[in-house]
Amino acid sequence: MAWTPLWLTLLTLCIGSVVSSELTQDPAVSVALGQTVRITCQGDSLRSYYASWYQQKPGQAPVLVIYGKNNRPSGIPDRFSGSSSGNTASLTITGAQAEDEADYYCNSRDSS
């Protein structure tokens, strides 16, 4: 039986930050099941504020997956991680799973 990779589409969209400056994200990306994907978000506000990352599946409310420097809410798998440098924040999914197929949004939040 031949192995067929499952392709996941991780979509990113732009939203405004809490400080009313624009953030821009990657276009849609695809990743094979089990591989690592990184989604980036850029904006001047990210020099002063951390990014929050949200996952949204069709017909469902957004779910916070990363906030602050690199914090995960309870129940979020450790394959999700966040990082930042300068005006760029990144969400990394290490070993993507089928259930990770979703839209991912970034937003900036206060660094305190």
Swiss-Prot record:
Keywords: Adaptive immunity, Cell membrane, Disulfide bond, Immunity, Immunoglobulin, Immunoglobulin domain, Membrane, Secreted, Signal
Chain intervals for the UniProt region annotation (Complementarity-determining-1): 42-50
InterPro entries for this protein: Ig-like_dom (IPR007110), Ig-like_dom_sf (IPR036179), Ig-like_fold (IPR013783), Ig_sub (IPR003599), Ig_V-set (IPR013106), IgV_Light_Chain (IPR050150)
Region (Complementarity-determining-3) location: 107-112
Renumbered residue ranges of the record's region Framework-3: 71-106
Disulfide bonds: C41-C106
PROSITE patterns reported for this sequence: IG_LIKE
PANTHER family with a match to the protein in the record: IMMUNOGLOBULIN LIGHT CHAIN (PTHR23267)
Name this polypeptide is given: Immunoglobulin lambda variable 3-19
Native source species: Homo sapiens (Human)
Gene encoding the protein: IGLV3-19
